[in-house]
Amino acid sequence: MADRLLAIIDPAGAKSFLAYSSIPVDQRGGIGSPRGKYKGWLGSLEPQAEDAGYLTARALIERGKKEKAFGRDGKLHMLAIAGDRSTPSSINRNQGMHRVVAEAPMVVLEEEVYAAWTRENAAQQAESLYRRYSDVKLIWAGNDLMAFGAMAAWEKRGGKPGVDAWFSGINTSTEALEAVKSGRMTALAGGHFITGAWALVMIYDYHHGHDFADEGLELRRPMFAEFTPALADRYIERFSGGFDGVDFSRYSKVRNGKLKRYNFGFAQLLEPQS
């Protein structure tokens, strides 16, 4: 889709910028890189999605160790419910999860399934997987909805999420944040939704004569924050009404002359205010 849009937009002399996801290299054909064939394609910014998978899987496994949620073989047994097999977001989140598993020899990843990002599919698949793998107590999910589906299937068996099985998810829905606060969800990462705001900061700087090219034309940056119950509470308190109170000029190189490198991590927006 992006390649077709560039072919329409660029001849008209309009500038363009891709936020959230660039065009995968293996799908570019003759498109090339920004400011090449399409001069008006300024660049792209995407969240480092692997971090979300890594942070949540790591926290989930650490909680499993703390709770001594070991199977009969003395290992931690985990299921992974991913979104899909093909989108960069899903692939990268899954890679982050797999990296943690590779670093943890006491963890057995029993099976990885794909639930198309939906609560209903995840619940249906989890119900079958729980019967198949009786030692599983850790369930990693590629988003919050699939985590809730897996929780519902666990509760249907008479279990209690956060008590006798532990779940992780990705996103910052109010339901997910409340689940972290209550203890039903053990690990949650999010904050990537604000990529659009960071992209506007970069475009603002470019428009005002400070080209972001000195940091690269296609940026993939850490953005995900790991939410503790305290941070979930702070997020709800601070941002439940929106983000109008955030002074994004602080993150602009034009407006903040001291800034040498863009920092697009979401965690900075959750820091205590003086």
Question: Where are the regions that the model predicts?
Answer:
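Hinge/cleft segment of the Venus flytrap/periplasmic-binding protein
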Residues: 76-77, 81-85, 198-274
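Hinge/beta->alpha junction and helix N-cap segments in small-molecule ligand-binding domains
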Residues: 22, 44-55, 80-99, 107-128, ...
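Hydrophobic alpha-helical
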Residues: 1-14, 97, 108-178
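Flexible loop/hinge segments that line or gate small-molecule binding clefts
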Residues: 7-51, 74, 176-177
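Hydrophobic alpha-helical segments within soluble ligand-binding/sensing domains
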Residues: 37, 43-75, 122, 172, ...
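Conserved acidic residues
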Residues: 42, 137-138, 186
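Structured segments of extracytoplasmic/periplasmic soluble domains
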Residues: 8-15, 59-67, 100-104, 128-132, ...
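Active-site/pore-lining binding-face segments in mid-to-C-terminal subdomains
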Residues: 164-225
